[in-house]
Amino acid sequence: MPPLDDESLLRRSFTVARRAQARGNHPFGAILVDASGAVLLEVENGYLPDHDMTGHAERLLATAASKKFDPTFLAGCTLYSSAEPCCMCAGAIYWAGIGRLVYGLSERRLKTITGNHPENPTLDLPCRTVFAAGQRPVEVVGPMLENEAAAIHAGVWQGETKS
């Protein structure tokens, strides 16, 4: 089987993030692909409409994947995320059994963009640190295409919070 086209698939997660933003949500998106690169799930950030602070795209995707697919299958899948998953999302990816992660924007760079915005409090706990504490491997690739990923957030986190 040929290797996955990580850049194209990651850009698809960027498209999902832009779609979330166009719908008034935070600009984060995630997709899940199988070993052949077939897209299985696409999930936007789910903060709105209920102001769910745990409605991160990666966590929502991991939950949906764990309900739909067997962990043995998920071990061969890749999650593409527009930004590095936070520790909550990394835990969800780990517990779902997803075997590989590719992300765009690093958590540290995201924090420089969002500052101390109340809708995006950031923990300095990289996903690699979370995965390293586990008993099964999760391959991590990223940051990748970080400037493209950062551009999605231009002008989003300044000024008033979303209602």
Where do the PLM segments sit?
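Immediate flanking context of iron-sulfur cluster ligation sites
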Residues: 71-83
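A short, polar/charged loop-to-alpha-helix boundary motif
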Residues: 49-59, 64
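Short beta->alpha transition motifs characteristic of CBS
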Residues: 40-47
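Small-residue (primarily alanine) positions within well-ordered alpha-helices
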Residues: 13, 17-20, 30, 41, ...
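Residues that line or immediately flank small-molecule/substrate-binding pockets and catalytic motifs
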Residues: 47, 81, 105
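Local cysteine-cluster metal-coordination motifs and their immediate loop/turn environment
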Residues: 81-100
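Zinc-dependent deaminase
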Residues: 1-20, 94-163
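Short beta-strand scaffold segments in enzyme catalytic cores
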Residues: 28-37
